[in-house]
A protein has these predicted regions:
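Anion (oxyanion) recognition and catalysis
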Residues: 6-9, 64
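A glycine- and Lys/Arg-enriched "phosphate-lid" helix/loop adjacent to the NTP-binding pocket
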Residues: 10-59
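NTP-dependent small-molecule kinase module
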Residues: 61-108
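Short amphipathic alpha-helical segments and helix-helix/interface helices
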Residues: 5, 59-60
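Short, well-ordered alpha-helical microsegments
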Residues: 1-2
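Generic structural hydrophobic/aromatic packing signal, biased to beta-strands
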Residues: 8, 15, 70-72
Length: 108
């Protein structure tokens, strides 16, 4: 998708990225199980774990450096909380340093 981001920017679009983070792969699996119980589609546990880590790696390694604006939101509880936001040429605002550190650790 990095190519798509660059192509859109080349056509004058401003690209915003909103990353909804869950605080553990376990919670991601629980959310999928809940969805399945309501008739939704399943995703195997190993795929959830792989995508959880890879998604965070891609967030920091590919997308944050190229999108115009980004934000990371903790979607673990009913009330969503902003973790951090920034963008090209903007100062990064960190609202929860502990959560941001935890997210980065999962991506290693």
């Amino acid at each position: 998708y990095a190519t798509l981001v660059h192509r859109a920017q080349g056509q004058g679009y401003i690209v915003h990225l909103v990353y909804f983070w869950l605080n553990s792969p376990r919670l991601a699996k629980e959310r999928v199980a809940d969805r399945v119980s309501q008739g939704g589609h399943n995703i195997p546990a190993d795929v959830i774990e792989r995508r959880y880590t890879l998604g965070i790696r891609n967030l920091f390694g590919i997308f944050i450096p190229i999108v115009d604006e980004w934000m990371i939101i903790d979607n673990s509880l009913l009330r969503q909380e902003m973790v951090a936001e920034g963008g090209m040429g903007k100062t990064i605002k960190v609202y929860d340093e502990n959560k941001l550190t935890k997210i980065k650790e999962y991506g290693k």
